[in-house]
């Protein structure tokens, strides 16, 4: 008889535990569960009425006189009685029973020609085999979508069908979740136990821990300086605060005045001290200037004053450049890929919109909103907008752009918007907490042109976008 369970186990291909190499879950079922016509009574045990032949080992055993029963019934009966249950022939152990090879061969020939359904098309069998461990799809609604719909076939053809059956039950070797073979690619992209490369520090982090890694551990993740609000890499924040932060208060130590200023103002304060001191010296020299030597000293002081002034101007320029360069890292570019866009377009009719997932640019939260078939009054036009969730009490200067790229084999041309520059001043009294800030266009392109020219071979629509934070300042309340 066909060893169906061993066949399934041979399909498994285990590899390194750090990769997703799902194994096939051996399917458990009874022949009557898959037969098209249930007329197998001839091969049922007369005692328990269950199947005589299941799995790989022979279950039908007989005594010396030919009385037949399944192995389960023999084991149960011989545990308390050492004789045949029919003819009472003495039997000391189950090893004295024999197989009925003629009946086994007859059953095998009979079964191979029977019409059967795939075990994965039986809801009860499928539900039973999906139980015991977490499963991706285990609700009644999704269960029916996972059942095999191949139709009837000969039992002898079942093994070849099962090798390619999309409803074959697999189990992830990493997270132990069960799923159907057709969902392999989906699980590959969603498994919480897969390691992903952190986009900031390039460390390999569990996908389920990536968000926590960014919030607490990633040394290259941009965090906000609590004093000057500039975004700084986590591993340089201490040095930034100790040596560079322009808003840290420090005490004047050069001229014993004891005054406290922010670091940005302390440099100017020191220059003012130097200028004042030199000016006082200049006044004294002027009063005592009675010879050419005194005139020479005055010229020297003027030269020093001029040098100090040049240093003062250079320092102010360096501070301005330093502030400007602190925003160079606040540039974000990405793509929003919408799968099965034709179905998506049919669902989001005129006036209906769809939002992308939120994304962070520095300390600011944005998302993309599209109108596949137009806003009110713009039916048939593809609208796209950049939405920003408000963060109050700041002046924000940024620019953004959108573009649709046609597939490589298309003759269509790229459609772009931007770069568009925006300057926002957000006070606490201006907006409600839930309101977002929108900018974009409701006539980006024609909705039908999107369907015709911009879908790739998978039916996906790719929207490329880029956002650059150019400047931000805190506005006192």
From Swiss-Prot:
One of its GO terms (molecular function) is zinc ion binding. Keywords: Coiled coil, Cytoplasm, Metal-binding, Repeat, Zinc, Zinc-finger. InterPro entries: MATH/TRAF_dom (IPR002083), TRAF-like (IPR008974), Znf_RING/FYVE/PHD (IPR013083), Znf_TRAF (IPR001293). Its main location: cytoplasm. A zinc finger (RING-type) spans 45-88. A zinc finger (TRAF-type) spans 160-211, 212-267. Residues 331-463 form the MATH domain. SUPFAM superfamilies: RING/U-box, TRAF domain-like. Residues 271-326 form a coiled coil. GO terms for cellular component: cytoplasm. It is found in: Cytoplasm. Probable adapter protein and signal transducer that links members of the tumor necrosis factor receptor family to different signaling pathways by association with the receptor cytoplasmic domain and kinases. Belongs to the TNF receptor-associated factor family. A subfamily. The MATH/TRAF domain binds to receptor cytoplasmic domains. This is TNF receptor-associated factor family protein DDB_G0278133.
């Amino acid at each position: 008889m066909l060893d169906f369970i061993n066949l399934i186990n041979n399909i498994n291909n285990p590899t390194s535990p750090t990769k997703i190499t799902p194994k096939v879950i051996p399917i458990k079922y009874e022949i009557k569960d898959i037969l098209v016509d249930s007329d197998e009574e001839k091969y049922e045990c007369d005692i328990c009425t269950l199947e005589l032949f299941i799995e790989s080992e022979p279950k039908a055993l007989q005594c010396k006189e030919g009385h037949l029963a399944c192995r389960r019934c023999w084991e149960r009966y011989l545990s308390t009685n050492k004789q045949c249950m029919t003819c009472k022939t003495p039997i000391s152990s189950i090893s004295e029973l024999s197989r009925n090879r003629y009946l086994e061969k007859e059953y095998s020939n009979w079964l191979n020609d029977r019409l059967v359904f795939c075990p994965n098309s039986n809801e009860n069998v499928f539900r039973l085999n999906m139980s015991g461990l977490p499963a991706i799809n285990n609700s009644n609604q999704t269960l029916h979508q996972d059942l095999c719909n191949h139709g009837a076939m000969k039992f002898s053809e079942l093994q070849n069908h099962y090798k390619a059956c999309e409803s074959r039950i697999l189990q992830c070797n990493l997270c132990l979740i069960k799923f159907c073979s057709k969902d392999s690619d989906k699980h590959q992209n969603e498994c919480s136990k897969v390691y992903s490369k952190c986009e900031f520090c390039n460390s390999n982090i569990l996908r389920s821990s990536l968000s926590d890694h960014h919030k607490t551990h990633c040394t290259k993740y941009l965090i906000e300086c609590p004093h000057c609000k500039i975004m700084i890499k986590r591993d340089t924040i201490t040095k930034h605060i100790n040596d560079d932060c322009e808003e840290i208060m420090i005490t004047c130590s050069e001229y014993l005045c004891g005054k406290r200023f922010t670091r940005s103002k302390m440099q100017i304060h020191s220059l003012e001290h130097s200028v004042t001191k030199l000016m006082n010296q200049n006044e004294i020299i002027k009063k005592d200037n009675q010879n050419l030597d005194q005139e020479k000293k005055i010229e020297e002081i003027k030269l020093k004053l001029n040098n100090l002034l040049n240093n003062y101007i250079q320092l102010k320029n360096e501070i301005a450049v330093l502030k400007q360069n602190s925003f160079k890292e606040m540039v974000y570019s990405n793509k929003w890929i919408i799968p099965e866009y034709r179905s998506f377009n049919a669902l989001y009719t005129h006036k209906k919109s769809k939002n992308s997932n939120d994304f962070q640019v520095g300390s600011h939260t944005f998302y993309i909103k599209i109108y596949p078939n137009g806003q009110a009054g713009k039916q048939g036009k593809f609208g796209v907008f950049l939405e920003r969730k408000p963060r109050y009490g700041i002046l924000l200067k940024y620019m953004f752009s959108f573009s649709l790229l046609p597939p490589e084999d298309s003759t269509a041309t790229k459609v772009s918007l931007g770069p568009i520059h925006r300057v926002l001043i957000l006070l606490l009294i201006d907006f409600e907490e839930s309101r977002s800030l929108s900018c974009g266009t409701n006539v980006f392109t024609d909705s039908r042109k999107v369907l015709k020219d911009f879908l790739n071979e998978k039916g996906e629509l790719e929207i490329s976008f880029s956002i650059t934070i150019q400047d931000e300042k805190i506005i006192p309340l």
